[in-house]
Regions:
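Basic/polar N-terminal segments that are highly enriched at the extreme N-terminus
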Residues: 1-9, 257
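An accessory alpha-helical subdomain
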Residues: 151-244
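Proline/glycine-rich low-complexity loops and linkers
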Residues: 62-65, 86-176
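Conserved short beta-strand edge segments in small beta-sheet-based binding/regulatory domains
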Residues: 244-257
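Glycine-rich beta-strand-to-loop/alpha-helix junction loops that act as flexible
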Residues: 19-21, 76-84, 157, 227-229
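Glycine-rich phosphate/diphosphate-binding loop of Rossmann-like nucleotide-binding domains
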Residues: 6-50, 54-55, 232-236
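N-terminal small/polar loop signature for handling phosphorylated ligands or for N-terminal nucleophile
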Residues: 34-87, 93-94
Length: 257
């Protein structure tokens, strides 16, 4: 890729912030990062950083203020439920220096959902509170909405709800050039392929080339993943990689994308 072509590549970045003591304690495994990163990649948004932080207001405030200034988009998961330790909405309001109160539309949606006023308890009403100036993010599954404050999108923590919230708002995102990928699987160990792989990376500096070892049928198997925005460059690098592996008497299989 020429310098002129590289300069025309539009890169849009994102950070994912997972909020929850239950993740840090090991009690719950996060499933949202992989989903969001995959979906964002399809839209041409590159996840450049992920953080896992506790339900501590000062930490949430500091983290949000840092990452919203560094990335085009920020996505948070967790901490907008009905219990006392669900403090994400209040913390984001503080990060933006605004107040927080019940959103009329959120209250209306939840009132319709629960039907019986006795079921719409004070605890559940907490989930209708959003920072002043926020735009609601629809929740097709359990109604209680997420919200958007400028470039920060706040979702619940339950994976099924995260997925539904993301699908409901992804049209708001403006992505860059889609990130494409190709994968070559080889039987050569990383220690053998490392030097030529490094040389290939130097020749194709516009691509990201990674090596991921594992076992397949009880034998060493290494997946070599090439990622970039220029398909022609990806094809050239992939073909060169396969040729190099064959010259080293190794097996090379390009996997279907």
């Amino acid at each position: 890729m020429s310098e002129a072509a590289a300069s025309q590549t539009k890169i849009v970045t994102a950070c994912i912030v997972v909020i929850g003591n239950e993740i840090l304690s090991g009690r719950t495994s996060d499933a949202n990062i992989a989903y969001l990163a995959g979906e964002l990649g399809k839209l041409g948004v590159r996840v450049m950083e992920c953080r896992v932080i506790p339900d501590v207001e000062a930490t949430i405030v500091a983290t949000i203020n840092e990452v919203r200034a560094r990335f085009d988009y920020v996505f948070t998961t967790g901490g907008i439920g009905p219990t006392h330790d669900d403090i994400t909405a209040d913390s984001i309001a503080r990060a933006f220096g605004v107040g927080i109160s019940e959103h009329p539309e959120a209250v209306a949606r939840m009132s319709r959902h629960y039907g019986d006023p006795a079921l719409f308890t004070p605890a559940r009403r907490r989930m209708a509170r959003v920072p002043h100036g926020a735009t609601l993010v629809d929740n097709p599954i359990s109604v209680a909405p997420g919200f958007q404050m400028e470039n920060v999108f706040t979702f619940a923590g339950i994976p099924m709800i995260v997925e539904s919230m993301f699908q409901s708002m992804k049209h708001r995102l403006v992505g860059g050039d889609p990130v494409l990928s190709r994968t070559v699987r080889t039987n050569l160990p990383e220690g053998v392929i490392a030097e030529p792989l490094g040389a290939l990376q130097k020749r194709f500096e516009d691509l990201d080339i990674g090596s991921y070892p594992g076992f397949r049928a009880g034998k060493v198997s290494v997946s070599l993943v090439l990622r970039g925005t220029d398909d022609a460059r990806l094809v050239a690098a992939t073909n060169e990689l396969i040729d190099t592996i064959h010259k080293m008497k190794g097996e090379a299989e390009e996997l279907a994308q």
